[in-house]
């Protein structure tokens, strides 16, 4: 009986080592052990190589492409040369404050051309003594230009008189010019009496008493007077064929000439034909009737 039990495993009974699960597990353990041996051998070979490095005991293999290392080694001399040049260059000066601006003596202010200047008062030239004739014309004062002949403004002429005279004489010149303007206003036809320069010269040489006389007011227009050559005309910038008066001025004169200060349109036309020389030649009953 004992002999039969001892022989049973050999004949038909399977042990735990002969089971398929055990064989599969042993195969996996063998593969893991083989992988560990392979990794250890590779680590030993990499440690023996010159380019290997390790961080905290963990092996890191060298890079597969050493080209970037070559580029860094090639760039190193150029970077070293640039650093040497920067070290040789002098240190840049500290920036200047806005109040301490460095001026270049080569860029001094230049004299302006004639087209960009006007008669300015330069006290340094007025207070300085007479300069020799060899001085350039740019250093001398530019004379003031004369006004145009068409400009007959009293303010501009008074300003010219102030520039010519000085002290008490300038006041006399201004009074003379104002008196001359009043005479021109009173003259018939709106024209200046006599030539302009001759009248101004005569007014200046006539004495201060005649120039300082108060300006006389203009006489009021006479309603009944005919609008001929003796009629005073109002100065106006607009000049028509019959004179300096406008249509509104003629209508006002016609209404003021009537006793009751009321006229119809036909009566106004009749007054124009009878009083204004320009309408005398062109007026008739049909045109005056409107």
Swiss-Prot record:
UniProt superkingdom: Eukaryota
Swiss-Prot/TrEMBL GO biological process terms: regulation of transcription by RNA polymerase II
Region (Disordered): 1-30, 44-239
Keyword field: Cytoplasm, DNA-binding, Phosphoprotein, Transcription, Transcription regulation
Low complexity bias spans: 44-59, 75-91
Stored InterPro entries: Fork_head_dom (IPR001766), WH-like_DNA-bd_sf (IPR036388), WH_DNA-bd_sf (IPR036390)
DNA-binding region: 242-290
Compartments reported by the entry: Cytoplasm, Cytosol
GO cellular component, one term: nucleus
Modified residue annotations for Phosphothreonine: 117
Biased composition (Acidic residues): 142-153
GO molecular function: DNA-binding transcription factor activity, RNA polymerase II-specific; RNA polymerase II cis-regulatory region sequence-specific DNA binding
The UniProt record lists the keyword DNA-binding: yes
UniProt function note: Transcription factor.
PANTHER family referenced in this protein's UniProt entry, alphabetically: FORKHEAD BOX PROTEIN O, FORKHEAD BOX PROTEIN O3-RELATED
The protein, known as: Forkhead box protein O3B
Organism: Homo sapiens
Gene responsible for this protein: FOXO3B
